Amino acid sequence: MHKDNDSGSGSNPGQVSNYLIVRPHRGGYIDLFRYGVRDDQTSKAKFLEMPDNREWSTITIDEEAEDHRWVIVVSILVRKIIRLLRTPMEFTGFVVDFFLNLFSANGGFFGLLLRLIQAKVVIPERGSVTFVSTIGQLDGRISLYKEWNFVEHLEGIDSVDSGRVKIELGSRGLMDLCVMASKLAYENAKVVENVVDLHWKMNLVEFLDCWNDYQKQMSTQVFVFTDKQKDANLIVISFRGTEPFDADDWGTDFDYSWYEVPNVGKLHMGFLEAMGLGNRDDTTTFHYNLFEQTSSEEENSKKNLLDMVERSAYYAVRVILKRLLSEHENARFVVTGHSLGGALAILFPTLLVLNEETEIMKRLLGVYTFGQPRIGNREVGLFMKAQLNQPVDRYFRVVYCNDIVPRLPYDDKTFLYKHFGLCLFYDSFYNETKAEDEPDPNPYGLRYKILGHVIAVWELVRGLTMGYTHGPDYKEGWFRILFRLMGLVIPGLSDHCMTDYVNSVRLGPDNELQMSSL
């Protein structure tokens, strides 16, 4: 659970960096009103924390930025509401998961009634190979794109040192593998193993539950698999995204806190914490965990670093990846994820570059994210573009229609969160557009709301007819239709569902994006 430590950022000695922490629970609603309406500085100081030696001039760009404080107010208000609803959300998720699996295990509602009469009801067991997450219930597809021969596309690749061997790995086939891996990341370890090994005929290497020191729980999940057990050509790393009923995950998406890394830029603090790289209650932990200490004065910290490998998502995945790249000399790796998982997917190579893992980065084939929130400011984008997208694009950010999450945190003059990389935008007809950013990057205004509701109505109609127009693989069940009805109330929420991302990849045009082994 999230905890706000009133002691602030800690008193441990160490590197002092620039940061901004939004603490929504240190002030009340009256303080929020005073800050939002009157720009009261006392109230502002309760919600926004920065280093003692910094001034607000280092945080904002100009005076006009103060006019955008309503964005901060809305963020604080949303996070207050999310925290208030944490327990009801957790309970609702528990009940929804149980009954959805109860229905599916007993042949639906009427099948359950029949089994009740016969006293043969099957009770679902959490963590079992048959217990499917809410995301899996919304979209039950597990098979890969049937027309793509995965092995043939990779066996023709020479070793990574053979030069610029261009291959069509931006095609629908690899995108489909990534989007399905991103969807599968929401499942428990047994379901993941069953799908990867038995259905995809590939090789699951590891499923990890990793530590988030701020939340004080194993709340970051990631799994790693290869296309085959021996002489693999491809390694895939898939991070779990925002779970529908996890208040902490949604709070992270709406968090505006950042930590500035010298010569890199400002990185989203919540995503760094999800990677197990620090705790905002002691900001010195970010510097310590971001930079592996090698000086003689810090030799005693090796034990702590080894402990971090066991608990931190970044270090744990890096250790596994190094071993796999050593075992499979011709293999390259792809990182993927949906929502929060997408943010962690692009943050992972960013951290590799930061730690000067040059040899690993040479083996990076690409990064695919789906519905990913912004992870940092413009400086981060400029820093990573040179590493990922030159001379060819290796980072592809997929956005479906009015999905609200890729538009968070807001790109405003106070926080300066910016996307980077090539955006593959799909509209409600699954038409693809390549651009630097999605339309309406900051979703507010009457026009956006009206258009959002109109599109939500069309998506509901389309969902009811997809099974007839595109075949049984695209038929949407009652639970997905119910979720589309929610889109009529909150446009953009339903669009974040994995269903439309899978449909976009499979029904959109064949992509001719080229990636190189570099």
UniProtKB/Swiss-Prot annotation:
CDD domains hit by this protein: Lipase_3
GO-annotated molecular function: monoacylglycerol lipase activity; triacylglycerol lipase activity
Residues of the active site: 339 (nucleophile), 403 (charge relay system), 496 (charge relay system)
Tissue: Expressed in pollen grains, pollen tubes, developing embryos, developing seeds and germinating seeds.
Keywords: Hydrolase, Lipid degradation, Lipid droplet, Lipid metabolism, Membrane, Transmembrane, Transmembrane helix
Catalytic activity, reaction form: 1,2-di-(9Z-octadecenoyl)-glycerol + (9Z)-octadecenoate + H(+) = 1,2,3-tri-(9Z-octadecenoyl)-glycerol + H2O; 1-(9Z-octadecenoyl)-glycerol + H2O = glycerol + (9Z)-octadecenoate + H(+)
EC number: 3.1.1.-
Traits of the deletion mutant: Reduced pollen tube growth.
The organism's place on the tree of life at top rank: Eukaryota
Broad class of enzyme this protein falls into: hydrolase
Transmembrane parts of this sequence: 93-113
Locus of motif GXSXG: 337-341
Compartment(s): Lipid droplet; Membrane
Role summary: Acid lipase that can hydrolyze a range of triacylglycerols without a clear preference for acyl-chains. Can also cleave 1,2-diacylglycerol, 1,3-diacylglycerol and 1-monoacylglycerol, but not phosphatidylcholine, phosphatidylethanolamine, or sterol esters. Required for pollen tube growth. Triacylglycerol hydrolysis by OBL1 may provide acyl groups for the synthesis of membrane lipids in growing pollen tubes.
PANTHER family in the record: ALPHA/BETA-HYDROLASES SUPERFAMILY PROTEIN (PTHR46086), TRIACYLGLYCEROL LIPASE OBL1 (PTHR46086:SF3)
Family in the record: Belongs to the AB hydrolase superfamily. Lipase family.
Listed name of the protein: Triacylglycerol lipase OBL1
Taxonomic source organism: Arabidopsis thaliana
Gene behind this protein: OBL1
